[in-house]
């Protein structure tokens, strides 16, 4: 039976009114399991109006009261995390264990945002001038919005919504129409936790909904995670309409493996970071850079052996290392890139194009592929594949290995495996990426640090979660005061005031 999904506006499930729907698939079988309404302009404007009205009161709640809502939300999610993980897995295709991780990393940011009474403390300067004190306030923006991707249907919405709500904003979430059920359930749980109706609205939709959020002057800021072309477009359009924007695009994350590295440790890291979640992660390691031919030969041999032992299965198979991709188009894209790599002259060591899961021939499965002797001019190196494909680019020495991620158009994350502290320190200072891991395969920062890439991986000067999130979702007001007012007896002054 195909489920009928809704929007979530004003604390209620709202049926679609546009007459346009998208299909939500079961990636394991390729069959449609739900229909999701795609909002038009009028529905999106209604959600904005509702949020603007609700935000007035919410923004005046004291920070500790808002934080208590987040803490109650954490308790509610904890009680049903197993069912949420299964629901997430059934629509996305990642394993249930991986879905638990998706939820957990999102909840980390909710915990961070619950510290908002401390995070919103302003600055104070006593007696900055004769009887003058200066202090700053952080005030909410009003209505803000988030456009989030299919690959983390719990984590990314929570990364954006939790700090925004904690700071006193109303939040409109436009999740991916591929797997919208978990975002809708999270909105219900926020309501149960005490969030006033309308402070968090969920609008499913496509371009028309996004354009409305970008153009409506009541929306003051917008966050996006997705492909680089769309990130660049949304950033430019938001700026043209006077909005703040933080937009995160594609990635081509490298792992540098030095000759002195623990090779078994590096292979373990690369197998998980390259093929986990079928490679559908913005922090996936898609490029391995062994330094020296001996290191490269040993790395490729060990990787080939490990790939042969990978178990690809249904997303609810507890023994599966990874499950299906999110859609048929994703499978076709991955196979197309493997075809392209062969045409470009890369050595295809492991070919996963023809993989099928017995009994699930219509499922969206792709096997693990491994290329060796990839070179920087190849498109399979330059472009994000977003699937279970790892490319090995051999570097003659450390300096060549350092140049590869530094000169790439994307600058999201990079990992270095070495036992040499001097090399590690030099690398972390010089490499041109926003996030760096040393003997850490997926360098996703903890919630109280910021997450974001450089170059064409990120647009905007403030990143996700951590202190940057608080700055992004607030504006600063600086107050200069002197008391009592009757103490001003010097008469009019026509020169700029100084504090001397």
What do the PLM-derived regions correspond to, one by one?
Residues 1-28, 353:
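Hydrophobic face of amphipathic alpha-helices that form TPR/SEL1-like repeat modules
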Residues 29-35, 219, 256, 304-306, ...:
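Conserved C-terminal structural/oligomerization subdomain of aldehyde/semialdehyde dehydrogenase
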Residues 30, 66, 88, 110, ...:
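Residue-level signal for inorganic ion chemistry
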Residues 31-120, 131:
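Glycine-rich loop-to-alpha-helix module at the N-terminal edge of alpha/beta enzyme cores
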Residues 33-39, 54-60, 146, 255-258, ...:
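Short, well-ordered beta-strand elements within core beta-sheets of diverse protein domains
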Residues 72, 131-133, 352-359, 441-443:
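Short, solvent-exposed loop/turn elements at beta->coil junctions and helix N-caps
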Residues 122-268, 395, 460:
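Rossmann-like NAD(P) dinucleotide-binding subdomain of oxidoreductase/dehydrogenase enzymes
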Residues 229-375, 404, 438, 485-489, ...:
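ALDH superfamily catalytic-core signature
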């Amino acid at each position: 039976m195909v489920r009928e999904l809704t929007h979530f506006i004003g604390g209620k499930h709202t049926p679609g009114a546009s007459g346009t729907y998208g299909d939500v698939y079961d990636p394991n079988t390729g069959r449609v399991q739900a229909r999701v309404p795609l909002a038009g302009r009028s529905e999106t404007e209604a959600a904005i109006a509702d949020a603007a009205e609700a935000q007035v009161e919410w923004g005046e709640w004291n920070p500790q009261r808002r934080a208590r809502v987040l803490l109650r939300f954490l308790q509610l999610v904890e009680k049903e995390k197993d069912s949420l993980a299964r629901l997430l897995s059934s629509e996305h295709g990642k394993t249930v264990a991986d879905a638990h991780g998706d939820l957990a990393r999102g909840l980390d940011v909710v915990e961070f945002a619950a510290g908002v009474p401390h995070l919103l403390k302003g600055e104070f300067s006593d007696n900055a001038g004769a009887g003058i004190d200066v202090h700053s306030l952080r005030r909410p923006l009003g209505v803000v919005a988030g456009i989030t991707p299919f690959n983390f249907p719990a984590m990314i919405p929570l990364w954006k919504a939790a700090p925004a709500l904690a700071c006193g904003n109303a939040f409109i979430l436009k999740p991916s129409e591929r797997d919208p059920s978990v975002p809708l359930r999270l909105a219900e749980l926020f309501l149960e936790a005490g969030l006033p109706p309308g402070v968090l609205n969920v609008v499913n939709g496509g371009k028309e909904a996004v354009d409305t959020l970008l153009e409506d002057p009541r929306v003051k800021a917008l966050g996006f995670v997705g492909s680089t072309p769309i990130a660049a477009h949304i950033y430019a359009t938001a700026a043209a309409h006077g909005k703040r924007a933080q937009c995160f695009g594609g990635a081509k994350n490298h792992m540098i493996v030095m000759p002195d590295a623990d090779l078994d440790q590096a292979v373990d890291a690369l197998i998980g970071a390259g093929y986990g979640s079928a490679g559908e992660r913005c922090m996936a390691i898609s490029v391995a850079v062994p330094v020296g031919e001996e290191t490269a030969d040993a790395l490729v041999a060990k990787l080939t052996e490990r790939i042969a032992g990978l178990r690809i299965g249904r997303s609810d198979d507890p023994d599966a290392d990874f499950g299906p991709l999110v859609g048929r188009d994703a499978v076709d894209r991955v196979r197309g890139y493997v075809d392209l790599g062969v045409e470009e002259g890369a050595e295809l060591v492991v070919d996963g194009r023809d993989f099928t899961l017995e009994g699930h021939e219509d499922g969206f499965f792709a096997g693990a592929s491994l290329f060796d002797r990839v070179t920087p001019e190849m498109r399979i190196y330059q472009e994000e594949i977003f699937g279970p494909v790892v490319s090995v680019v051999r570097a003659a020495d450390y300096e060549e290995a350092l140049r590869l991620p530094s000169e790439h158009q994307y600058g999201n994350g990079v990992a270095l495996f070495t036992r040499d502290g001097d090399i590690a320190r030099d690398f972390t200072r010089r490499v041109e990426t926003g996030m760096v891991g040393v003997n850490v395969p997926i360098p996703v920062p903890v919630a109280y640090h910021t997450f974001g890439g450089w170059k064409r991986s990120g647009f905007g000067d403030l990143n996700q979660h951590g202190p940057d999130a608080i700055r992004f979702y607030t504006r600063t007001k600086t107050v200069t005061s002197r008391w009592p007012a009757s103490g001003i007896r010097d008469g009019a002054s026509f020169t700029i005031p100084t504090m001397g």
